[in-house]
Amino acid sequence: MASTPKLTSTISSSSPSLQFLCKKLPIAIHLPSSSSSSFLSLPKTLTSLYSLRPRIALLSNHRYYHSRRFSVCASTDNGAESDRHYDFDLFTIGAGSGGVRASRFATSFGASAAVCELPFSTISSDTAGGVGGTCVLRGCVPKKLLVYASKYSHEFEDSHGFGWKYETEPSHDWTTLIANKNAELQRLTGIYKNILSKANVKLIEGRGKVIDPHTVDVDGKIYTTRNILIAVGGRPFIPDIPGKEFAIDSDAALDLPSKPKKIAIVGGGYIALEFAGIFNGLNCEVHVFIRQKKVLRGFDEDVRDFVGEQMSLRGIEFHTEESPEAIIKAGDGSFSLKTSKGTVEGFSHVMFATGRKPNTKNLGLENVGVKMAKNGAIEVDEYSQTSVPSIWAVGDVTDRINLTPVALMEGGALAKTLFQNEPTKPDYRAVPCAVFSQPPIGTVGLTEEQAIEQYGDVDVYTSNFRPLKATLSGLPDRVFMKLIVCANTNKVLGVHMCGEDSPEIIQGFGVAVKAGLTKADFDATVGVHPTAAEEFVTMRAPTRKFRKDSSEGKASPEAKTAAGV
């Protein structure tokens, strides 16, 4: 068994960081005040502590490199044997955002790492995937490219008020868009492969399956590893109703052979709204069917109302409180959607955007004792460790906050925890997010409802105005902005915006909310004029106030209306 490495430290034994390590790892600690080491045998949460013996490893790109030898000092930690050779220190199943981040960070810390991924495809399946994962290949990136494409029709319409005239009506070629989009995806997956290669991460193509806590099978080839990371993401979910075989999901919607003429989109979440905006902008007839009264469950109520109204003004038809019951194919090839309220006919496509499920099927996790939720999500602790000490999970497969930047954060934190002796919890405070609907949404922090529940005394500032650009275009576009402030501390608890450039604007305010800035800090900040963003630093009087004992939910007579509107 490898000897326990000695950590010479000038940190006091009362240091929280040192106390954490002492609780989690078997360490021989040398402190300045101690003349001899004391060995601490401790529980299993972290898997390994490492000696610094050099090792030469041969990777798939045939380059040799020297790395630190990471050997588990106590087999009771994660079951790995300290004197046994393992092919890798970390084997990751899934080369999406979280898996790639964890793998390349691991090698930068001196560990050996491999990642396996299915062959490239724009549509995921049990046999196809691709390096880059959902975000790069069938999520954030291709969707945003289609959002850009769809916005041009609005720009053409806007431009008339600014003097632009067109001899012919602009037309759109769907085939060109999809071909160019797919070429960009091929370029991006190549970049990701290059990143892995440069980081000395071995990339293995194939489907990975966990055989035991330290063994992975990739299409019949066996690899041993000290730690396994599951980062396989999720897949679109279509409910089991008659005619479901006629439905498309978000993967297919990004890669259709032809543009829809009339499309039914079932779902009221961000994916449904984003695709509704895309197809509406590309001059398709769009109908959105939602089970609830409003779209975007979980978002701020004012934002939910505002975005629904604005999208309706652009010609999208919302069918509220309707549940899908069946899809019926007509003799002419068109589809009808039967709902709890009736039947709507004549659709060229029926799309379901009814959520995503963790992609944990056929990974062998049940056989090794990994605990999962009813929806298939892998249950993890605050350090992303599963119920099996040597198996970890990050990203959408854990169903925590299903955002690409969050998966990146989780992957980086895991690598630090395992291979840098730096136990790191992902920080989920004040995570900003965006919905690329049209108009788009940017939000960070608490909703009004959450703030009232958690703090009681809350001041709400809102502004609903016509942006400068719309004054000449003559279009009904408006912008909604909202600040939620703790009345007792003056701390800004939430920032919400719906309108052009909201996602770009919210990133900066995400820093402000994370830093704990106050409304006074906002008020003391000079605005940039003329911009929509300056509204966030010029809203002086609250629209309404809420107090624990009594609610003043009425509009303030001093409520601010945007200047110049």
From Swiss-Prot:
Record function comment: Catalyzes the reduction of glutathione disulfide (GSSG) to reduced glutathione (GSH). Maintains high levels of GSH in the chloroplast.
Top enzyme category: oxidoreductase
Region annotation Disordered: where it falls in the sequence: 544-565
SUPFAM superfamilies found in the cross-reference section: FAD/NAD(P)-binding domain, FAD/NAD-linked reductases, dimerisation (C-terminal) domain
GO cellular component assignments: chloroplast; chloroplast stroma; cytosol; mitochondrion
NCBIfam families reported in the protein's UniProt record: gluta_reduc_2, PRK06116.1
Superkingdom to which the source organism belongs: Eukaryota
Name of the gene: EMB2360
The UniProt record lists the keyword DNA repair: no
Pfam family for this entry, one: Pyr_redox_dim
Cofactor binding note: Binds 1 FAD per subunit.
Residue range of the transit peptide in the UniProt record, numbered on this chain: 1-74
Protein name listed in UniProt: Glutathione reductase, chloroplastic
Required cofactor(s): FAD
